[in-house]
């Protein structure tokens, strides 16, 4: 139902044409699951300004892709805040860290959530609330855990991982 993944942008490849980015994404990004490729670019990564993309698909609908790349660790942290707000108030929104894209989530009912992304082409989707939020939490956890494991001397995402654990507990209590 949901596919969520994180890609890290290769700093040695300049993105000049968004129209070819999707078809050539492997030239510009490394999949977080590909540890050997990640390790091969470790020396050129700027861990204070880590660019990448979060890929989110619901069935066949693309909600986020490589064309919305940004500071990926910050974006994941922002998404965790949105999830926390949705669980607390039914609504959460954020702007991307380094570009003027607004992302929002609103509870439509106990079991539905409206996901909106004000990108060049506006994305709107009503998604199963529980499954979507859980998939996002798991996607964030995978990203932060994998980064901590792979780049132990360069990053420390323990605060984000603690927040994920807190969200899991709140999630299980609220939904």
Which positions does each model-derived feature cover?
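N-terminal "first-domain core" detector
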Residues: 1-56
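Aromatic- and glycine-enriched beta-alpha-beta binding-site module
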Residues: 49-95
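Mixed-charge, glycine-accented linear interaction segment located at domain edges/termini
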Residues: 122-175
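Charged, low-complexity, helix/coiled-coil-prone segments
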Residues: 9-28, 72-86, 152-159
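A short, charged
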Residues: 43, 90-96, 100-101, 148-162
């Amino acid at each position: 139902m949901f596919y969520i993944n994180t890609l890290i942008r290769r700093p040695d490849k300049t993105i000049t044409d968004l129209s070819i980015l999707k078809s050539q994404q492997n030239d510009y990004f490394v999949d977080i699951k590909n540890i050997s490729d990640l390790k091969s670019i470790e020396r050129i990564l700027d861990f204070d300004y880590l660019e990448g993309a979060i890929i989110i698909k619901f069935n066949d609908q693309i909600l986020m892709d490589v064309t919305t790349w940004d500071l990926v660790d910050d974006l994941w942290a922002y998404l965790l805040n949105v999830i926390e707000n949705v669980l607390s108030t039914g609504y959460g929104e954020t702007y991307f860290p380094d570009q003027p894209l607004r992302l929002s989530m609103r509870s439509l009912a106990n079991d539905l959530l409206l996901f909106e992304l004000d990108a060049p082409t506006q994305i709107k989707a009503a998604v199963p609330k529980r499954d979507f939020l859980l998939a996002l939490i798991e996607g964030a956890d995978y990203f932060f855990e994998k980064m901590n494991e792979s780049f132990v001397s360069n990053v420390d995402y323990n605060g984000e991982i603690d927040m994920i654990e807190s969200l899991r507990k709140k999630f299980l209590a609220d939904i």
